[in-house]
């Protein structure tokens, strides 16, 4: 991370009250920049004693609600002129079989992971264009292939990928950058606040993996990705490359591998 890159920039972060979003805010709070957090709850950063160089504004927002996004945009437009970076970070996971997931749960997952982010991006786009800015979306390797036990989650992220890839090409002449960032398993509340097939909270703990990352590790990689003008699809660990490669080279082998590895997740 290059602190000089971020000096004076105006940065919007969604879901900054915990996890990766909070880690992004924490890292940037040490730099003289303007930070705007959109989330339902206030970031811990604002509750701590002592000043920090960054200017931080929290706007309480339900990111699945167009009405609340509109209110947040109105406040941002009144306070700031131009956005340099948007971290579209807020999201929800859903764990259940395809035939055990209610259509209402699919809709709720898409409202948070797809419709919310693209509506926010569309509404902020005039401000982002003004500063020739960057949009970086927190996604998942589950968006690269349909993962068993994650049909709603995978499909919502795959849809987001497609929109941002199209937007990247369409807006390339105006200099707007779009980055899709796929972190590995991370120590966040994602599984605790996720949904089961009926739309109820999962209340699951961290994924049992020796390779699990901290939010701070992921945030640093995301900040580096924004700084790199060549960033497009950034995959942080080998599992994502494995999925991308095998889906084209050996799809039947990939399906058998996922069936065995994730069998307990959909039975």
Each predicted region: which residue ranges?
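Conserved glycine-rich Rossmann-like NAD(P)H-binding loop of the short-chain dehydrogenase/reductase
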Residues: 31-46
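Active-site helix of classical SDR
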Residues: 121, 156
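SDR active-site lid
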Residues: 173-238
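Residue(s) in the substrate-gating loop at a strand-loop-helix junction
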Residues: 140
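The beta1-alpha1 cofactor-binding region of Rossmann-like NAD(H)/NADP(H)-dependent oxidoreductases
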Residues: 61-71, 103
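Substrate-binding pocket helix/loop in short-chain dehydrogenase/reductase
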Residues: 97-98, 102-107
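Conserved glycine-rich cofactor-binding loop
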Residues: 17-18
């Amino acid at each position: 991370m290059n602190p000089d890159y971020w000096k004076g920039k105006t940065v919007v972060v969604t879901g900054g009250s915990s996890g990766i979003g909070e880690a992004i805010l924490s890292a940037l709070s040490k730099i003289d920049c303007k930070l705007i957090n959109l989330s339902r709850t206030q970031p811990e950063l604002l509750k701590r004693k002592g000043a920090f160089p960054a200017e931080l504004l929290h706007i309480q927002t339900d990111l699945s609600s167009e009405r609340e996004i509109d209110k947040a945009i109105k406040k941002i437009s009144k306070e700031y002129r131009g956005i340099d970076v948007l971290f579209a970070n807020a999201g929800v996971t859903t764990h259940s079989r395809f035939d055990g997931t209610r259509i209402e749960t699919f809709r709720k997952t898409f409202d948070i992971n797809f419709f919310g982010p693209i509506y926010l991006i569309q509404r902020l786009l005039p401000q982002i264009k003004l500063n020739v800015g960057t949009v970086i979306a927190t996604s998942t390797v589950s968006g690269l292939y349909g993962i068993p036990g994650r049909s709603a989650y995978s499909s919502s992220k795959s849809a987001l990928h497609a929109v941002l890839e199209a937007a990247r090409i369409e807006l390339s002449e105006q200099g707007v950058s779009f980055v899709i960032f796929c972190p590995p398993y991370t120590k966040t509340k994602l599984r605790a606040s996720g949904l089961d097939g009926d739309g109820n909270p999962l209340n699951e703990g961290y994924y049992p993996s020796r390779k699990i990352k901290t939010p701070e590790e992921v945030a640093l990689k995301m900040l580096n990705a924004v700084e790199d003008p060549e960033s497009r699809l950034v995959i942080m660990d080998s599992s994502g490359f494995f999925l991308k490669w095998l889906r084209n080279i050996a799809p039947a082998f990939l399906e058998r591998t996922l069936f065995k590895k994730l069998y307990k997740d959909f039975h």
